[in-house]
Amino acid sequence: MFPRISQAAILAHSLLAVCTSAATLAEKVRGVNLGGWLVLEPWITPSLFDEAGDEAVDEYTLTEVLGVEEAAARLSEHWNTFITEEDFALIAEAGLNYVRIPIGYWAAAPLDGEPYVSGQLEHLDNAVAWARAHNLKVIVDLHGAPGSQNGFDNSGRRGPIGWQQGDTVEQTILAFETLAQRYLADDDTVTMIEALNEPHVPGGINQDQLKDYYEETLARVRKNSPEATLLLHDGFVQTEGWNGFMTGENVMMDTHHYEVFEGGQNAWSIEKHIDAACQLGRQHLQAADKPVIVGEWTGALSDCTRYLNGKGIGIRYDGTLGSNTAVGACGSKSEGSVAGLSADEIANTRRFIEAQLDAFELRNGWVFWTWKTEGAPGWDMQDLLANGVFPQPLTDREFPNQCNF
């Protein structure tokens, strides 16, 4: 039996820890992810996957279908053109201060017998140099682990979760160590490194073993930098559920916030979407005892984007995924520019973005997902900025005080 502790005492302790740890971060993180560049995702660049046929549903199967030579040629062209220094200049002009760059284990510590092609680290090197030139900071994000830590296509290979089986954790540590050695030593541009993106605890990842892995990654960070911040994804466990773990060690939590991946969310009113974002800030971010950022989030209010749930998989909004009841037809929400949405949809997207900015800046900031797509309304920051839907300056509000903080 544990003694009962008053809620007031718990809150007081939590707020003290929050104030103490939050003081270690000098400025708010206001960043954007470079998704779909060095780790492919079908919904961000559907053309790459359509050209490869139906069997190409993730980076693993894409490279497997194409073969080494053709895959290397196509991916090299993609890496050279999808993100360039001009993007970094535009990101800086928008008032952002961070870029989070996903990278897969296969780029840092490839495994024999797998079809992935390499060469990504040279482009990550370029990205760090471009960031430095434009006064941006970098979060290097280990986005995919051997066996897949979540079963999502953005881990490199969709399907069953196989991470923590066999020697996959040890292989992941090797990949992480390679990244830490390459990017943390003698560099003040890469100020954060993420241990692993979205390990899926509710999906079967063992949280105690995940904590052990996080401890191992911290040791690798400290071997290369006394000051770099280790970013820990919450594993889809409420962020404050990690309270008491690895406090006071330049460690920061990362939580991701989307309101489209559960069936009922696609039918929510804009008011309910806004309330959910505000509640995340008010209840969960404020309760964490370490600095915390929302490392992925979106302006999208539906899951209509083509391939968002996976290539060959349906959509909740239109009722083609599982037993979800249709909310309506996706229409212009599926692809193209945010400018193709109705006036009400554009206004609601702006409202939703502003509410999230307010909520997430209650703590240490945010990193929007993502900078660029081939046409995904609400997800593409470059498109949102060009159409006046993402605030400029970032503090501008057409819908102020939505959260009543």
Curated annotation (Swiss-Prot):
EC number of the protein: 3.2.1.58
One cellular component term from this protein's GO annotations in UniProt: extracellular region
Membrane-spanning residues: none
Gene Ontology biological process terms in this record: cell wall organization; glucan catabolic process
Disulfide-linked positions: 278-403, 304-330
Catalytic residues (positions): 198 (proton donor), 296 (nucleophile)
Pfam families xref list: Cellulase
Necessary cofactors: Mn(2+)
A molecular-function term among this protein's GO annotations: glucan exo-1,3-beta-glucosidase activity
Signal sequence segment: 1-26
Keyword annotations: Carbohydrate metabolism, Cell wall biogenesis/degradation, Disulfide bond, Glycosidase, Hydrolase, Manganese, Metal-binding, Polysaccharide degradation, Secreted, Signal
Reaction(s) catalysed by this chain's protein: Successive hydrolysis of beta-D-glucose units from the non-reducing ends of (1->3)-beta-D-glucans, releasing alpha-glucose
Compartment list: Secreted
Enzyme class: hydrolase
Family label: Belongs to the glycosyl hydrolase 5 (cellulase A) family.
Protein name: Probable glucan 1,3-beta-glucosidase A
